């Protein structure tokens, strides 16, 4: 005999739902967003298809053009462990001293009809002591306030390891301007200091650079600091020589 409190099998029924008709709400939203992203990506790729016929250099330093090197100075600096030393400071007397140690390549004097497309500051670092095993570190800043006075020594905080050939290379080109620069020969011949101030720093950034090592001891480093000018190479309008062989 059943009462109102007794359990009746017919009162409660069990239903089995087929999962193929139900999907996770998160999966539905993610799938919709994924399809939308793929459609937008295809549209963007179609707009960039005309650029496939152009080639660009992954590293601008290795791109088209000729590199003209001007070595500014070679010096030996001592760097203590866990610190980085200021080696390039254009805002002070660093490059306005009377004793210039410039070493020019024979090909440097840039003629008037050549265009300068970019300028790189290149710092080559070499250990002076034999059988030393450490790596070089470097840090730089480009957009400094003209009145900013950098510290001579700083602690190592998130530095960059110097790559192959122990060479640290910085592009000094300003975004949206500064290139090309022409007619450098007369300025350079008249006064090198005026050439640096009026031509280079009017069109390119003034960097400050710190270098260091990951060594646990004080190290002696030979630094070679140079400016490398990327010169645009173009074919002349007329052949240089005329004769039977041409």
UniProtKB/Swiss-Prot annotation:
Gene Ontology molecular-function annotations: structural molecule activity
Keywords on record: Viral occlusion body
One Gene Ontology cellular component: viral occlusion body
SS bond partners: none
Any single Pfam family the record assigns to this protein: Polyhedrin
Family label: Belongs to the polyhedrin family.
Protein's job: Major component of the virus occlusion bodies, which are large proteinaceous structures (polyhedra), that protect the virus from the outside environment for extended periods until they are ingested by insect larvae.
Protein name (database record): Polyhedrin
Annotated source species: Buzura suppressaria nuclear polyhedrosis virus (BsNPV)
């Amino acid at each position: 005999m059943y009462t109102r409190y007794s359990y009746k099998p017919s009162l409660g029924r069990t239903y089995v739902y087929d999962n193929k008709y139900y999907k996770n709400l998160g999966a539905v939203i993610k799938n919709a967003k994924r399809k939308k992203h793929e459609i937008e990506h295809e549209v963007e790729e179609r707009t960039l298809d005309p650029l496939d016929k152009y080639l660009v250099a992954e590293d601008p330093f290795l791109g088209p053009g000729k590199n003209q090197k001007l070595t500014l100075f070679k010096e030996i600096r001592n760097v203590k462990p866990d610190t980085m030393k200021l080696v390039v400071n254009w805002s002070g007397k660093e490059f306005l001293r009377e004793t210039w140690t410039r070493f020019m390549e024979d090909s440097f004097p840039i003629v008037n009809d050549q265009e300068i497309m970019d300028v790189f500051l290149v710092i080559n670092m070499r250990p002076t002591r034999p059988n030393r095993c450490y790596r070089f570190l470097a840090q730089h800043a480009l957009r400094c306030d003209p009145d900013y006075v950098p510290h001579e020594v700083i602690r190592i905080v998130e530095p960059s390891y110097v790559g192959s050939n122990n060479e640290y290379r910085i592009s000094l080109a300003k975004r949206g301007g500064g290139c090309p620069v022409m007619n450098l020969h007369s300025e350079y011949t008249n006064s090198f200091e005026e050439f640096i101030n009026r031509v280079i720093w009017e069109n390119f950034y003034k960097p400050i650079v710190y270098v260091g090592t990951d060594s646990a001891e004080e190290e002696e480093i030979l630094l070679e600091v140079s400016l490398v000018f990327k010169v645009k190479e173009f074919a002349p309008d007329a052949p240089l020589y005329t004769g039977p062989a041409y």
